[in-house]
Amino acid sequence: TAEPEIGEDAHLLFMQLSGLGPVINLKQILHSPFTLHSQLMAKIEREAAFARAGKGGRIIAKINALNESSVISALYAASCAGVTIDLIVRGACSLRPGIPGVSENIRVRSIVGRFLEHSRVYWFNNDGNPETWCSSADWLYRNRLRRVETCFPIRDPKLASRVHEEALQNYLSDNTQAWHLQADGSYLRATPGAQAPHCAQLALLEKYGS
């Protein structure tokens, strides 16, 4: 990015890593083990508050793994409040979707294919003013509370739309390589059925070349 504030934040972050001093206040970047966890928890609660107010709520996240207990509890609470949640979790996931009264508004899918997936994208509807964030952090205890990780906003509307379409909606539409996590912890492979087959990774290869 060429955004001056994010560049300044990155400079301050590396200064902190290479020296001693108090926790720094960054303008745009969220960083663990300091602000990332609390701010993302607040964003989940904000979606729940919108849902309780009858405004709906929507969360989409693409990560490699999920086992941090307070995040799982917050997602369960958001689901109970009426927030629709889609999680694209490539690997281990301790959350259980589709449990009545707990997580019936949460869907989890895993996609493993040709790509070594490492993009982490968090999307919040924010009452019709969507926020798109990219991060180095999975939703694990070690990433959010024990390591230095970063999370930064995609401010440019065109770039945010591209990330939403290619990294999120594209993968939510996959019906050939996706596996749906069930409430009992098992996975059920998606099938096209009457729909046209769609492979998220193949779509990107066809768009950008193999």
Language model segments and positions:
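A ubiquitous short alpha-helical element
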Residues: Q28-I29
